[in-house]
């Protein structure tokens, strides 16, 4: 894989949806808890799959999981799990569907304890500030960091599912707590 393709981080290639996601979302700091929950749901669903697979099903996940309303998702039942096992537009994996409901409940508990999931996330960062890396090559980008290690460990202790350090790191990248746009990427020049 090339490091830079058409001025962008090479991982997004030339797929229109991937390029739009790269340019408009990935690496941009998200302070809104609803959007942070959306990324948490999508990143958890990605376990073992490619990100583009989940990105293409994003609207299906939006419909299936109540427009990413954590309170409504937290109230879902076993009947909802069965319904979602037949829902078009999402990956039909019982464990990840159930984990989304479990994670919604834990997400709400964190909001109650910390005031917001955003503040909870910042608590794992030095000086409570996002990290902007200056990598030149895709091969330099790690799969995890001390921040994702600590956050995923804490989340696991709290009962979150499908959110190990690699998925946590991807979540932190997607939501801009860790900006890994390559040094020569056009998104660095914004």
Where are each of the predicted segments found?
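HhH-family (HhH-GPD) DNA N-glycosylase catalytic core used in base-excision repair
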Residues: 1-190
